[in-house]
Each structure stands twice: as C-alpha cells, then as structure tokens.
C-alpha cells in the first residue's frame, strides 16, 4: 500500500554514531586466493565488510587487527575474526565524508556462539 502524500520518512540511521561487534568469516572470503595475497586480501575484505555494514566509504583499520591477521604469516590467515565496528564523526574539517568507521580487533577465547551485538558508549 502506498503511504499518504503528507507522511515523511524517518531520519536515516546511517548518520548516527554507533558501535557494533561482528564476527567476520575470512575463510569463505579468502577461498581460492593465492598464498602470497591472502593476508593483504583479508584486510581488503574486512574494509569491504565494514563499508557495507556501516555505510561509510572511509574505513580505518586498527594496527592490532592488522597484527592479528598477519600473526600466522601471509598464507595462514585465521578463519574467523571478531571485530568492533565503530561509526564516528570525522573531526577533520576539510574531509570529504562526515563519518568514518574504525575497525578494531576484539580478542575472544572462542568464536563459537557469538552474535552481532550493539556496544554501549560506556563499554568502549
């Protein structure tokens, strides 16, 4: 059914600052990738995942996440990784985008049974 003419859509949630935790399955994203390109491709796939989930083209990857992905070498990238995606306001005045996404590594004992969670600002 069509909406009445005077009714307006709600505010887009993409402009809000939000933080969520995700589990990224790198195994399926790196299937068929040559050995010497696996760790670099893993970084690119996480960037692509963050861009899609948060809707911001500006994605920044934390150094601890980079170190974790490279920890077993260029070939043997971990199958799954738990990440925290944080959509934040860009303080830089001359930047092209108002928001950016910061991707940080969340160390967990076991990946099993975890789901996507919203993280409060107090927990960050």
Curated annotation (Swiss-Prot):
Q: Which GO BP annotation is one of this protein's? A: cytoplasmic translation
- Gene Ontology CC annotations of this record: cytosolic large ribosomal subunit
One example GO MF annotation: structural constituent of ribosome
Record has Ribonucleoprotein as a keyword: yes
Enumerate the InterPro entries for this protein. Ribosomal_eL31, Ribosomal_eL31_CS, Ribosomal_eL31_dom_sf
| Residue ranges of the TM segments | none
> This protein's superkingdom?
Eukaryota
Q: Does the keyword Ribonucleoprotein apply?
A: yes
- Cite a single Pfam family from the UniProt record: Ribosomal_L31e
Q: Provide the alphabetized UniProt keywords.
A: Ribonucleoprotein, Ribosomal protein
Task: Identify its protein family.
Answer: Belongs to the eukaryotic ribosomal protein eL31 family.
Name the record gives this protein: Large ribosomal subunit protein eL31
Gene assigned in the entry: RpL31
